[in-house]
Amino acid sequence: MSYLHAIILGIVEGITEFLPISSTGHMIIASSMMGIEDSSFTKAFEVIIQFGAIMSVLVLYWKRFLPHWGFYRKLFVAFLPTAIIGFVVKDVVEHLMGSVQVVAWSLIIGGVILIWADKAFAHLTMMGRKTDDLTYKDSVKLGLFQAIAMIPGVSRSGATIMGGLTLGMNKKEAAEFSFFLAVPTMAAATLYKLLKIYKTIEPAQINLLLVGCAVAFVVAMIAIKFFIGIVSRYGFRGFGYYRIVLGLVILILLYTGHDLQMV
C-alpha cells in the first residue's frame, strides 16, 4: 500500500462512513480496484481509518458529549450487542471482508430496504422521538441492528438509522444517534485491530494509518453536514437507488469475467 492508496481510501472512508451506503464495502471495492494486497494490515487499515472519520463526530457534536451520564449509559448499552456478537463471529467477519461478491449482494439488499423504509417511515416528522426519549430496551435493539452491519456492504449507519426509524425516531435524530453510537463502536474496533497488529506493524505502516485517518477526519467533517441536510430534505431513497445500481454493476463485472477480488 502506498501513500496515494492511503489518501484515496481516506477520502472514500470520509465520504461514506456516515452515508447509508457502507464505508467498509466501498473500501473493499476501492482496494480491489487498486490492486492492494489482501493482507492482515490491509484489513486492519480498513477498520482503523474509520476511527479518523468518527473523530469528526466528537468535534462537530462536542456539546452532546459533555458529562451526561444517562446519554453515556444508553450509548454503552447500545454498544454491548455489537461487542458481544462481534467477538463471537469475528473470524467469519474477517473472512467475508475479502469478498467483493458479498459486498455487492449486501448493497443491493440494503438498497431495497432503504427505499422501502423511506416510504414506510415518511410520516415521521421532526416531532418523532428524540435520543433522550430512548429507553435501555430501545438501546439494546439499536445495538442489535448495528450488529447486522458486521456483514460487509450492509452499512453500520444504514442499519442503526433503520433501527432508529423502527423505534419512532425521525430521520435526523436517527442519523445523529447513529453518529454517536459509532464513537464507542469504532473506538473498540480500532483498539482491537491495533492490539492484533502492534507487534508486527512497521513504521511505514504507522505513517499510512496516520495519513488515512487524517484524510478521513477532514472529509468526514464535510460529509456529515452534507448528509444531515440531504436526509432532512429528501430522505434515504436516493442512497437506496445508488446502492442497488452499484451492487448490480459489481455483479455484472464479476459474472462477465472481470476479476474484482482482492489479490
From Swiss-Prot:
UniProt entry keywords in alphabetical sequence: Antibiotic resistance, Cell inner membrane, Cell membrane, Cell shape, Cell wall biogenesis/degradation, Hydrolase, Membrane, Peptidoglycan synthesis, Transmembrane, Transmembrane helix
Role: Catalyzes the dephosphorylation of undecaprenyl diphosphate (UPP). Confers resistance to bacitracin.
Membrane topology label: Multi-pass membrane protein
Membrane spanning residue stretches: 1-21, 41-61, 69-89, 96-116, 147-167, 177-197, 208-228, 238-258
Subcellular location: Cell inner membrane
Enzyme class: hydrolase
Protein name (Swiss-Prot/TrEMBL): Undecaprenyl-diphosphatase
Domain of life: Bacteria
GO biological process, alphabetically ordered: cell wall organization; peptidoglycan biosynthetic process; regulation of cell shape; response to antibiotic
UniProt keyword Protein transport present: no
Catalytic reactions on record: di-trans,octa-cis-undecaprenyl diphosphate + H2O = di-trans,octa-cis-undecaprenyl phosphate + phosphate + H(+)
Major localisation: membrane
Miscellaneous: Bacitracin is thought to be involved in the inhibition of peptidoglycan synthesis by sequestering undecaprenyl diphosphate, thereby reducing the pool of lipid carrier available.
Gene symbol of the encoding locus: uppP
InterPro entries in alphabetical order: UppP
Single annotated GO MF: undecaprenyl-diphosphatase activity
Family: Belongs to the UppP family.
Record EC number: 3.6.1.27
One Pfam family per UniProt: BacA
GO cellular component labels: plasma membrane
